[in-house]
């Protein structure tokens, strides 16, 4: 196995809160997959939930070396937790096609948050 990419992102939670206050659920609709959307709608901390998902997806786009463009969208990267609570990534659409093209075999996600920030790192391996 070889490392194909590494991405890190940090999000100021207040910034996400301000966007939600200004534009309602538009950002959440653009960023979240259908499964994440269902969780977000009833989550006890929806702003923090969205900020963490946003950080992971930005980090993933950086790890893939593309950013969010050329057919890639935030909602094609889905963050979920495994049976131990560890954050994982599931890919859809163009993100999945890109992973297959690059020969991605493993994706590692780490996520941390404090009062004001959410931070994520994603490593992709062949």
Swiss-Prot record:
Cofactor: Mg(2+)
Keywords carried by this UniProt record: Cytoplasm, Fatty acid biosynthesis, Fatty acid metabolism, Lipid biosynthesis, Lipid metabolism, Magnesium, Metal-binding, Transferase
A single GO molecular function term of this UniProt record: holo-[acyl-carrier-protein] synthase activity
Subcellular compartments: Cytoplasm
Primary subcellular site in the record, as a coarse category: cytoplasm
Gene Ontology process terms (BP): fatty acid biosynthetic process
GO CC term (a single one): cytoplasm
Domain of life, source organism: Bacteria
Substrates-to-products reaction catalysed: apo-[ACP] + CoA = holo-[ACP] + adenosine 3',5'-bisphosphate + H(+)
Pfam families registered for this protein in UniProt: ACPS
EC class name: transferase
SUPFAM superfamilies: 4'-phosphopantetheinyl transferase (SSF56214)
EC numbers, comma separated: 2.7.8.7
Entry-linked InterPro entries: 4-PPantetheinyl_Trfase_dom (IPR008278), 4-PPantetheinyl_Trfase_dom_sf (IPR037143), ACPS (IPR002582), Ppantetheine-prot_Trfase_dom (IPR004568)
Binding site for Mg(2+): 9, 58
Protein function: Transfers the 4'-phosphopantetheine moiety from coenzyme A to the 'Ser-36' of acyl-carrier-protein.
Family under the similarity heading: Belongs to the P-Pant transferase superfamily. AcpS family.
Subunit relationships: Homodimer.
Designated name of the protein: Holo-[acyl-carrier-protein] synthase
The organism of origin for this protein: Escherichia coli (strain K12)
Lineage of producing organism: Bacteria, Pseudomonadati, Pseudomonadota, Gammaproteobacteria, Enterobacterales
Gene: acpS
């Amino acid at each position: 196995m070889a490392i194909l990419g590494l991405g890190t992102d940090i999000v100021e939670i207040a910034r996400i809160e301000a966007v939600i206050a200004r534009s309602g659920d538009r950002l959440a609709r653009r960023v979240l997959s259908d499964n994440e959307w269902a969780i977000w709608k009833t989550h006890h901390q929806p702003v923090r939930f969205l900020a963490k998902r946003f950080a992971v997806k930005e980090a993933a786009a950086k790890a893939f070396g593309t950013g969010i463009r050329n057919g890639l969208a935030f909602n094609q990267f889905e963050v979920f937790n495994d049976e131990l609570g560890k954050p994982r990534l599931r890919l859809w659409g163009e993100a999945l096609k890109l992973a297959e093209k690059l020969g991605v075999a493993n994706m590692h996600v780490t996520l941390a948050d404090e009062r004001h920030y959410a931070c994520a790192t994603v490593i992709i391996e062949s």
